[in-house]
Regions:
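RNA/tRNA-interacting regions in translation and RNA-turnover enzymes
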Residues: 2-242
Length: 242
């Protein structure tokens, strides 16, 4: 209930494991040929070498046991039950394309996969884990670990070189440089430059849809107002004459 609540509130999918059933280290890897998994819904799946997996290491064999398909659905082994006493919380970020392909390959349109394939804020994971832990402490009388595990491999967003003149060229809006800069800043972007009408714009982590200059033009047009775009009647075609 806690992991589902956090997902619905923050948009970050999470998963919980019965800590007493698994053995570290936890390994994230691609599936090997011939591997299988029984998911939480009781269905058996033949895994593809393209599937990204969450695994543990029983008897010291690193990554040898499959716990779930990353970002899609957990396995039956390691699930939390009424007898569970210790919980391992997973709050992670996975590649959109990889998750979408695995979900479709195995016909598992889970709530988690739907969110991952549409893009999840890659800076949200610590906050989601903290929120889940606090809820378990408050309502489940749990005791949080003092040493959470954190593997931070998030890449910084690539800045977009943006010319203010693109707003007029693409959207037909006569918008001054300061207004454009203010709008992009208001939606969370980091804006640098602008003296010669060119900006270096770094989108915020929660806007994975902002990747190209045209995406920024769309944001400016949306916030200035589509009703401000001038209406121009296309010229009528002229028939050729001899």
């Amino acid at each position: 209930d806690v992991t589902n609540y956090v997902m619905l509130d923050l948009g970050q999918p999470m998963h919980a494991y019965d800590l007493d059933k698994i053995e570290g280290p936890i390994v994230v890897r691609r599936a090997n040929e011939g591997e299988k998994l029984t998911t939480l819904d009781g269905k058996d799946h033949d895994l593809s070498v393209e599937d990204l997996l969450i695994t543990d290491s029983p008897n010291g064999e690193r990554g040898s046991r499959v716990l779930g398909i990353a970002g899609v659905m957990g396995g039956l082994y390691g699930e939390v039950t009424a007898e569970t006493k210790n919980i391992l919380l997973e709050s992670a970020h996975f590649d959109q394309v990889s998750i979408a392909r695995s979900a479709r390959r195995h016909k598992i349109p889970s709530e988690a996969s739907r969110r991952f394939e549409r893009g999840v804020d890659d800076q949200l994971q610590p906050a989601a884990a903290q929120m889940a832990a606090e809820l378990l402490v408050k309502y489940g009388n749990g005791e949080p670990s003092e040493h959470p595990t954190d593997y931070n491999t998030v890449c910084n967003r690539r800045p977009i070189l943006f010319k203010a003149s693109e707003v007029a060229r693409v959207a037909g809006l006569d918008t001054d440089v300061n207004t454009i800069s203010d709008i992009l800043t208001d939606i969370g972007c980091t804006v640098a430059g602008g003296g010669n009408g060119e900006f270096s714009v770094t989108p915020p982590s929660w806007r994975p849809d902002l990747n190209e200059p045209c995406d920024l033009v769309e944001e400016v047009a949306r916030l200035v107002g589509y009703d401000e775009i001038p209406v121009t009647v296309p010229p009528a075609p002229v028939e050729g004459k001899v």
